[in-house]
Amino acid sequence: MDVEVAILRSMMKNARTETVSGIDFIIGSLEGRRVVLARSGVGKVFAALCAQTMILKFGVTEIVNSGVAGTLTPELHIGDVAISTACVQHDMDTTAVGDPVGLISGINMIELPADTKIADELDRVCAAANVNHRLGVIASGDQFVHTTERRVWIVSTFNASAVEMEAAAIAQVCFVNKIPFAAIRVISDEASGDVKIDYMTFVKAAAATSSDIALRWLRARA
């Protein structure tokens, strides 16, 4: 989110920006730690491009990805937070050649596990901040999931708690590069899809939540 990047950028020290493949990477220090901050763009390709550039060009050793997602569980409501235990690509489908749905060829995995240490740290940070949150599977795909039928299918197939468009691509890049990774998502809509929100108002609140979690996480590691 642009708003979240702006919040964190304003708190960074010795910040400089490099643009690679159309993505702005902000390099500096935050809460005493060297960080690289970027807004990848929408979809799995941009997300993977951003993550791979962070690893190869800027030498990051961990990645935490934040953003918004739709809830797939009645335990998470608008403004709550989902933390990944694993990510899946719900639109990956090679069942025509005998594979199970969601299988990523080459690495032969469906679930891309989050780093348990980072996920546990984010869990503790959210608890300390009194943010309602759940750990679970986050499902990603290059489509905006807006029908009840698709949501029900994703839950029944992958037991996912939230759905969005980027996290699993970053998880795959991190897995093949052996980089610890976890994702956090602020919930933007209810499981039923019935509750409507003012998007710009929500984005500001979501950015405040996710940037606060990021800062608390960095402070806890200082």
Where are these regions (language model features)?
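A C-terminal functional module that forms or caps the active site or interfaces directly
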Residues: 144-192
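N-terminal short beta-loop-beta anion/metal-coordinating cradle
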Residues: 1-52, 57-58
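Generic non-transmembrane alpha-helical segments
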Residues: 117-132, 173, 209-220
